[in-house]
Amino acid sequence: MKKNIKTLIISLAAITSLTACQDIKDTYADMAGDGEIRYIGKCDNLTVSPGWERLIVNWTNNSDPIIEKVKVKWTNDIDTDSVLLDRGTTTYSIGNLNNSTYEIIVSSLDKDGNESLENTIYSRPYTSQHEEVISFSRVVAKQYFLDNNLIMLFSGWQNGLETAYLKYTKKDGSEGNFELNENIASQPIYVLPDEIDTSKPVNLYRTGHIGSCKDLIEFDPYELSKEPSFTSDFKEFLKTKYGTDGKIINSTGNVSDSWAKNLQTLELDADINSLEDLLNMPNLKRLVVGKNTYLTEAGANDETRGQYKVFDPAISNKVLEIMHQHTGLVVERYNKHYQELGKESYIKDMGATHLPEIDCYDI
């Protein structure tokens, strides 16, 4: 009995040893029915890199000698397509793709069209509908058209931005081009050197790199809007001062275009982020600051509670300079408001405000 058990253990050990020492071939072999089923060696190390309206597929081929072709297949919810490539090919660029996530399948084929096990991966190309493309900096954050001048405020020079330039029609009718750069975009406000025909479009063109995109992206041209826009704090000031009956501003915040274009004197009694809204007023001659705020001497000297402030003096000083050049604007400043403004000849200190005399009648 012991001899039989010993023989059985030796036999099992020998079988196990044979199984363990058998090679696990890349061409996979199985037994089924009366014979061996031979699987074709599949591709490995499948990766995909997104590009502009394309996906770049890379893989490692199997050394199986019976491989004749490599099949690359791509599909989304709408379309399916594929291509057969010569043995040894290790990369393929799938072009003309839409804004969609694609399933990429790579497999090996022998001369009879028998196919290996598949290797699958998913990826999405960059297109004009991609959220990273849509949110990419347009460089020009806000623009104003004053007479024949384009005045720009910038959002900065985003990482990845390669080029940005404007195309427009000059005042004399010829075509104009102006290249923006990081130095210009770092300025708080900038006046285009060329005078332009403001009735014609001004388009912004950009190229750049985004995220993992392998290609230089040429973004769709963007037309600068000529619709006047006002800052939120200036609109709040107008609502407080004039109400929202629509003559100057309505309840939704739309400022009357005719009011802004024809205004010659603006009385401003409020803290404000910047004076950029004045660029929407091509006929403004006088900016009167603090005239309607009555303070004691102590109140006027109180920097915290008694003095209106401009929180962005860099933009505001440049705006006043531009307006003075174009409309002859003069600033009349009462008490000690807007001390952040520069010491310019067109900024006149008017001293303290005085309560108006009121005639009283006995009834």
Say what each PLM segment does.
Residues 22-65, 115-159, 213-228:
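Pro/Thr/Ser/Gly-rich low-complexity, intrinsically disordered linker/stalk tracts
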Residues 81-88, 178-185:
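Short beta-strand segments within Ig-like beta-sandwich modules, predominantly Fibronectin type-III
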Residues 246-363:
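Concave beta-strand-loop units of leucine-rich repeat
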